[in-house]
């Protein structure tokens, strides 16, 4: 397990773009993608890939839960297998199945403990060039 990112919920794509440009001095355009299971769109900063911007859809539970505020929402750890997220237990997971997310990630959340929301992230398998069946490769 290793640190992957922090997720910041912001009110809109324009707020995320402004934060990136003005505060992080990252002028690369954010590339947004949907996470349908969580009713939101997300993007990672090019310059600071450890920061994820989350913009919930109007009907998302995040809007009701957070009252429309911009907040630090979660911390995420990369694990080998999101269904068996060692050192955590599968019984600690909120959802029965992981959700597909941007950049080929699979994600799930652990049941909150003392208010801290933790996401577990499984990165896509990379293939070795010239050997499409080999894990750890580059296609």
Regions found by a protein language model. Give the residues of each.
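Non-catalytic surface loops within mature trypsin-like serine protease
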Residues: 12, 57, 79-81, 114, ...
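Generic secondary-structure microfeatures
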Residues: 24, 47-49, 55-58, 79-81
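Vicinal oxygen chelate
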Residues: 2-12, 42-46, 51-53, 63-139
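A cross-kingdom feature marking solvent-exposed beta-strand/loop segments within repeated
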Residues: 35-36, 58-64, 71-73, 94-96, ...
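Loop/turn position at the start of each blade in beta-propeller repeats
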Residues: 1, 38, 70, 103-105
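Long, hydrophobic N-terminal alpha-helical segment
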Residues: 1-38
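Amide-forming acyltransferase catalytic core, primarily the GNAT-like/NAT-type
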Residues: 28-36, 40-44, 56-62, 139
């Amino acid at each position: 397990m290793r640190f992957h990112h922090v997720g910041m919920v912001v009110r809109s794509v324009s707020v995320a773009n402004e934060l990136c440009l003005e505060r992080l001095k990252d002028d690369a355009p954010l590339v947004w993608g949907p996470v349908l299971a969580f009713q939101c769109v997300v993007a990672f900063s090019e310059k600071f890939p450890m920061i994820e911007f989350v913009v919930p859809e109007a009907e998302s539970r995040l809007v009701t839960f957070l009252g429309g505020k911009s907040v630090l929402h979660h911390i995420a750890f990369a694990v080998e297998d999101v269904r068996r997220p060692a050192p955590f237990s599968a019984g600690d997971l909120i959802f029965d199945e992981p959700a597909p997310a941007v950049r080929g990630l699979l994600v799930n959340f652990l049941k909150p403990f003392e208010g801290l929301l933790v996401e577990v992230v499984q990165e896509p398998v990379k293939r070795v060039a010239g050997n499409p069946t080999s894990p750890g490769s580059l296609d």
